[in-house]
Regions:
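Exposed, low-structure sequence patches enriched in small/polar residues
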Residues: 1-300
Length: 300
């Protein structure tokens, strides 16, 4: 199973993740069976890319049907060609017996991904194109502080079910009170956005983070203060095609800001976020999210 409307950066599939808490909060998935073949190459300097052909059977595990020209699809096949490319133009690399490794990380870094359906191949049901882009920037200061910027954008053309559009990474439980909604924070998620609240066929996302030096309160209590702001903008083309699920769009924008106190004790921290702007909710408490953070420090 996989989260609906989530973006998977194929070139990141071999990235090393110690702990990713967000999946434990997700409640809406789709079942899929896929076969794929591809090639990974680092032929172009300072890039890594994956070129892939795949055929996927998809069955949403929630109340949803895709309406294409009056025909309702509750399950479907997607045959696609995809290229996913990471480009780190300012980093330094070293060639080793086991391959090329990044020895000095420098920013910005860029990731591109293009997916195209293949009509009349492998029982493919829909014709579409999907373009995704991401850039990351990080500035480390001599005093130990750090500023991080992240920008992502996605755009779809053609006919594509909700399962493969964009949800902009919500991470707020659909429960009544602030205490009931306390859960683990994601890395780059909208912490005040409820699951399945917004969907988009095109979107842009920006995140700003600034990390201050750790505050020495007690011998083992040294929290790391981080200020965070996030914003998103998007829209849904052909909304009449998506049947059975209620949602909103990001046409008016989405904004949240917050403070993280990470690694208060043994990697455990606490954070709070506030939702504001055009999509602010009527009840004050519904705009607040309190989260638990966890960071495992391996010492390198």
């Amino acid at each position: 199973v996989r989260e609906i409307a989530s973006t998977t950066w194929t070139v990141d599939r071999r990235a090393f993740k110690i702990y990713d808490p967000r999946p434990i909060n997700i409640s809406t998935f789709y079942h899929y069976q896929t076969w794929k073949t591809g090639v990974e190459t680092k032929f172009i300097p300072k890039t890594e890319s994956i070129w892939e052909l795949s055929n996927t059977f998809v069955e949403p595990k929630f109340n949803y049907a895709y309406n294409l020209d009056g025909k309702l699809f509750t399950k479907y096949n997607l045959t696609t060609a995809m290229v996913s490319l990471r480009w780190n133009p300012f980093s330094d690399y070293m060639q080793t017996p086991t391959g090329r490794i990044e020895t000095e990380k420098r920013y910005p870094k860029f990731t591109f991904q293009f997916t195209k359906s293949l009509p009349n191949v492998g029982n493919n049901d829909f014709e579409f194109s999907k373009i995704d882009f991401r850039t990351e920037y990080q500035k480390n200061y001599l005093n130990g502080q750090k500023t991080s910027l992240l920008f992502e954008a996605g755009y779809t053309i053609g006919d594509l079910p909700l399962t493969h559009l964009y949800n902009t990474s919500p991470n707020n439980l659909n429960k009544e009170t602030i205490i009931q909604r306390v859960t683990f924070a994601g890395k780059n998620s909208f912490e005040t956005m409820f699951f399945n609240e917004f969907f988009s066929s095109k979107f842009a996302y920006f995140q700003f983070k600034h990390s201050f030096n750790r505050i020495h309160l007690l011998k083992k209590v040294k929290p790391n203060l981080v200020v965070v702001s996030r914003m998103g903008l998007g829209d849904m083309e052909k909304p009449e095609q998506h049947v059975g699920i209620n949602y909103k769009t990001l046409r008016d924008g989405y904004f949240e800001s917050g403070i993280e106190l990470n690694q208060i004790y043994n990697g455990i921290g606490l954070s709070g976020f506030y939702r504001y702007g055009p999509n602010q909710l009527a009840k004050f408490q519904d705009n607040i999210a309190v989260k638990i953070s966890f960071i495992l420090n391996l010492g390198f």
